[in-house]
Amino acid sequence: MPAKSKDIFVVRCSILGDQNNLLGLAEALKNEFGGEIKVVDIRFRSRVLETLYLHLIQQKHESKIWDHVTSFFCVGDIPAKEEVDGAFVVSTLGAGELPAVYLSKLGAFSIHLGELKRIPYNLIDMTIAHPGHVTKVDEFKLPCAPSSIDEEKLLPKVKRNDLLVAFGGDTGSLTYSRNFYEKTLSLAAIAAERNRLTLKITTSHRTGLRNEEIIQEYIQDRSLKVDQLALYNQNDVPSMGFLLSNAAIALISAESVSMISEALAASAKTVAIYEHALPKEERISRFLEEQLCNNQIMLIDAISSDYIELASLQFPSVSWKTPFLSAVHRKLNKKNIRAAA
């Protein structure tokens, strides 16, 4: 087991939602094992060196020469071996796989979020499937995406008085219409008034400037009472943790697994709102159906609905931290037993 003072290295990811997921894992590890969270930007010098490195580390005969030559392969925030030995490294996406292996070879316990596409599973200590994916034999499944939101730091659920609308945006074959944004805002305004809640609205990097203009125009034309409008393209978006801190109810566009997971982590009553049909991407639709089956969310078609009946909607009870940390302890124990054998 890593010493209490060992750090958690987060391999930087350029996609905001995925980076937040990694920080959620890192926060959970920090609270359980201590240490500091360090975000590192590690890159291989070239594709050729990536291929060479992957080939070399799979050879059966290794020697201490690795301690002297591995730094040749990478550039960026390269920590010293003594910093990494016994620590954690968390990564995601294809770009994070080899940097995670690199730090793992220096002695870190490696955790990768998402399917491994470039390296064998035996090179990573623990692989976590993305929510909604069919879990493979070598992968661990969480009930929702990791989040850095700490529910204990939020207002008690019964004292919250916000209704938060969080828009994701177009993805893959999914393109939201103007009508979707306008109907969602209408439903949110009606729900906020009926439940005596304060209306707050936020967007994300996928919403797009044009759709943010649609949102602004609709609010102005209908004179909606909006307490806070946080637009991504105006660099005006606080963290989801902050926005959800007083949210009794969260209406979130259905394609955003990350934002839905954050609402669940914040114990907000969560409504996933879609246009005509659930997103076609199987991973997303499977995640939504799992949460619906477990009574964690409500699914609403914005186009065909005149209002949202929230009376039966319960506060979610899903937790990803407990099963995650239990799995980490099991994996650590197995690794330590193998190392001692």
Annotate the PLM regions.
Residues 215-258:
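Donor nucleotide-activated moiety binding/catalytic core segment of transferases
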Residues 288-341:
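Leloir-type glycosyltransferase catalytic cores
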Residues 15-18, 240-282:
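A donor-sugar binding/catalytic signature common to diverse glycosyltransferases
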Residues 11, 147-210, 232:
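Active-site donor-nucleotide binding/catalytic segment of nucleotide-sugar enzymes
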Residues 40-41, 127-129, 199-205, 274:
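Short internal beta-strands
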Residues 10-140:
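Active-site and donor-binding regions of nucleotide-sugar-utilizing enzymes
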Residues 116, 121-180, 306-310:
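A nucleotide-sugar donor-handling region in carbohydrate enzymes
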Residues 3-9:
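Extreme N-terminal starter segment of soluble prokaryotic enzymes
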